[in-house]
């Protein structure tokens, strides 16, 4: 059941990413590829993700020092680069930062981050407002999305990823 839900979610993220790419003049194929691969490490165990982060420290972006919920994005980017032949740095960046963001996010980074937060199956208070905003102003939507994510993480009593905080301050 988890795989079916994950697959459906991935297709919804792809659809939203392509829609946003059209709006903002980003390459639709790059957006689609990033979306299709963004959660490809989601089913990997924490121990396996830790091994991947340790094996490729040059791509680990802070690795295991960061909160575990962001590891799957970084690991997905590492696997895309090392196992699946993806060489497009923009696609790899978007995959790696789709959970927490980072300072200096590109348009593609923002598109994937927002597509993941607002894809069709998402149903959280404020998602409709963010869906409208992301079609009008990418940076304003990104700021609202990062605030939503950061507030949610803090409300759960969990540590805030330093990259997420830096991304928010950067926009």
Where in the sequence are the language-model features?
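Residues that cap or flank secondary-structure elements
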Residues: 8-9, 68
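Short, small-residue-biased leader/transition segments that mark boundaries at the very start
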Residues: 1-6
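C-terminal beta-signal and terminal closure region of outer-membrane beta-barrel proteins
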Residues: 145-149
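Charged phosphate-binding loop/patch that engages nucleotide di/tri-phosphates or the phosphate backbone
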Residues: 151-171
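Divalent metal-dependent catalytic cores for phosphoryl transfer on phosphate-bearing substrates
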Residues: 18-144
């Amino acid at each position: 059941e988890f795989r079916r839900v994950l697959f459906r979610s991935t297709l919804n993220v792809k659809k939203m990413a392509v829609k946003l790419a059209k709006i903002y003049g980003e390459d639709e194929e790059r957006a689609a590829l990033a979306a299709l691969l963004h959660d490809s490490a989601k089913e990997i165990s924490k121990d396996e993700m830790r091994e991947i982060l340790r094996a490729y420290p040059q791509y680990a972006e802070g690795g295991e020092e960061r909160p575990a919920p962001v590891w799957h994005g970084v690991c997905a980017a590492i696997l895309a680069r090392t196992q699946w032949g993806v060489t497009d740095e923009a696609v790899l960046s978007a995959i790696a930062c789709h959970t927490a963001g980072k300072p200096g996010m590109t348009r593609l980074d923002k598109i994937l981050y927002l597509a993941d937060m607002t894809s069709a199956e998402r149903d959280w208070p404020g998602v409709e407002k963010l869906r409208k905003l992301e079609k009008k102003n990418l940076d304003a939507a990104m700021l609202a999305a990062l605030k939503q994510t950061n507030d949610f993480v803090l409300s759960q009593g969990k540590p805030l990823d330093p990259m997420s905080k830096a991304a928010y301050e950067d926009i």
